[in-house]
């Protein structure tokens, strides 16, 4: 009987650990950052479109991220999370790669990061993790500033788990 109980307790702990990790915003943003770093250093080069806007093109290594959804969709698959890469345009951050959908069911490319607590933190070079509204939906989210080789903020990475 003791062996059966121990096996069941170990299985329950294993499931709890997997569930906690799968929905841990800090672990998910760390995974997104690792995926981007594996591609290469962040940089801006030229311009591209994001929805109806012309914005700087953001690259990781030689891969342009604007309108490329491989990384954000991989994060969704691995963590059941939304993910976005924003590029800095003036004093705004514009979505250039995202799996966040608009109310019409389209990717939110070209929409801006709302000026909220996350915006304030990343604008100052700090991470933000907490509850936030993204295009009308509540999320437990993390945002990190994306910096180029000189340390200049050129964008933002985001992940969110629906509440």
Give a label for each model feature.
Residues 1-20:
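Gram-negative bacterial Sec-dependent N-terminal signal peptides
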Residues 21-22, 126:
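N-terminal leader/targeting segments
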Residues 23-65, 100-104:
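Extracellular/periplasmic ligand-binding regions of membrane signal-transduction receptors
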Residues 28, 33-46, 72-93, 129-131:
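Short N-terminal helix-loop-first-beta-strand/juxtamembrane motif that initiates sensory/input modules
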Residues 59-64, 137-163:
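Conserved beta-strands of PAS-like sensory domains
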Residues 66-80, 97-136:
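Extracytoplasmic/periplasmic sensor domains and loops in membrane signaling proteins
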Residues 92, 106, 150-152:
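Residue-level signal for well-ordered, solvent-exposed loop/turn and beta-edge residues enriched
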